[in-house]
């Protein structure tokens, strides 16, 4: 069950672990864990104010054996606000 598993999100371009379980491991306050209360299987990564520099591959990992993982490509369209 997902209740006894750790879900982590990693940014692939620099291998930076952004979140693990409910903890955020980046000083960039735009990142947060999205985990609706009562839904143990839903773990998302929220990024507010995405910028072109944020584009790239992000990977969700679950500490199962073997490890479960799913990659997501973030594409940012539009102009960057200054």
Region spans (language model):
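Extracellular beta-strand/loop-rich beta-sandwich domains predominantly from IgSF
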Residues: 16, 22-57, 64-66
